[in-house]
Structure formats: structure tokens, C-alpha cells
């Protein structure tokens, strides 16, 4: 008779998904329109266009750029269009919003691009602890994507998972 310890977690057949795998290493930078406003509040078309013409756009090469205005100013839509047209040759992408909003968007895009076929009829645990903070939006989106295909969905670690969803027997 063998008294060797048995790893019941390893034998459970659970599949663990770590939301941190969707964190990117892309460069995300902000472009604040406030820096191009007269007195930090007013957009003067001629001055703005000249600033856009003389700005060094190569600094954004390969980056994902979040175009926003940190001042409480009214920015005409064409100003965002002009910035986008200047960023297009260099930047990987541009987005209207803050850098944090852009990081969230990129994170969600990766979740939505995930091949859910590998989780079909599996018992899945979505890892809850990690080195990187993961927002609730990620857990919501992972649940939305996986629920239609998994046998069961849990949160936490394999040794102490919280049940979230279980497919009803047909």
C-alpha cells in the first residue's frame, strides 16, 4: 500500500485561466490637448494647426496613443480628427480617452479575441489573485465570453474556488 500524497487539485480536471495573460506590454501614452490650448482653456484654430504642424509625431512611433483633454475646455471634433490624422503614420493606434481607458480597451480586446473553444465543456477557474491588479471589467468580460461554452465557471484558486456558474444538465 502506497502512502504517497495525492494531489487532488492536479487530478480534478480543472482548467485555470489567469486574467493577467491578457495584460499587454504595449506602449500606451497620453496626448493631452490642454498643452495646445491658449491659456490652457481656449482652442485657437490657427495656433492649434501650427502646433500640430510643427509637433514631433515620431515620439509616438509604435505606441497606442490616448488623446484627451485634462482641462475643462470645449474641444471641437475637428481637433480630434486633426490629431488622429497626424498620429496615423506613426502610432499603432489612437483612442479618444485617457491612457487608463485605452489600457482597459486593449485588455478587453484581447479577452474578446481569446479562442473559447479550448474551454468547451471544461470546469474553469478564473484566477483571482496575482501580482498585477485586474479590474472588475475583466472578470465580467471573461464570464460573458466563457459562460456559453463551459461546464462550470469558478473564481479563485483550484483549492478554494467560489462557484459562479454551472451548466444545467440537459
Indicate residue ranges for each PLM-predicted region.
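N-terminal, charge-rich interaction modules
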Residues: 1-75, 84, 91, 149-152, ...
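A domain-level signal for the structural core that forms small-molecule/cofactor-binding pockets
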Residues: 52-53, 112, 128, 137-138, ...
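Short glycine-rich or small-residue beta-strand-to-loop segments that form or flank ligand, phosphate
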Residues: 64-70, 95-97, 123-129
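Gly/Ser/Thr-rich loops at beta-strand to alpha-helix junctions
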Residues: 70-77, 129-137, 160
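Long, charge-dense
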Residues: 79-118, 156-161
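Short, non-transmembrane amphipathic alpha-helical segments
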Residues: 82-87, 138-147
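Short acidic, glycine/serine/threonine-rich loops at helix termini
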Residues: 106, 137-139, 165-169
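Extended, charge-rich low-complexity interaction segments
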Residues: 116-140
Amino acid at each position: 500500500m502506497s502512502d504517497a500524497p495525492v494531489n487532488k487539485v492536479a487530478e480534478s480536471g480543472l482548467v485555470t485561466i489567469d486574467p493577467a495573460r491578457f495584460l499587454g506590454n504595449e506602449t500606451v501614452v497620453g496626448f493631452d490637448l490642454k498643452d495646445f490650448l491658449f491659456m490652457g482653456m481656449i482652442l485657437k484654430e490657427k495656433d492649434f494647426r501650427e502646433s500640430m504642424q510643427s509637433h514631433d509625431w515620431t515620439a509616438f512611433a509604435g505606441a497606442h496613443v490616448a488623446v484627451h483633454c485634462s482641462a475643462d475646455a470645449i474641444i471641437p471634433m475637428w481637433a480630434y480628427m486633426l490629431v488622429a490624422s497626424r498620429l496615423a503614420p506613426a502610432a499603432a493606434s489612437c483612442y479618444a480617452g485617457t491612457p487608463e481607458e485605452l489600457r482597459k480597451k486593449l485588455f478587453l480586446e484581447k479577452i474578446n479575441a481569446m479562442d473559447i473553444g479550448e474551454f468547451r465543456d471544461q470546469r474553469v477557474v478564473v484566477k483571482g489573485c496575482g501580482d498585477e491588479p485586474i479590474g472588475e471589467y475583466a472578470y465580467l468580460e471573461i464570464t460573458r465570453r466563457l459562460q456559453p461554452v463551459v461546464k462550470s465557471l469558478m473564481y479563485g484558486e483550484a483549492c478554494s474556488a467560489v462557484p459562479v456558474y454551472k451548466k444545467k444538465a440537459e
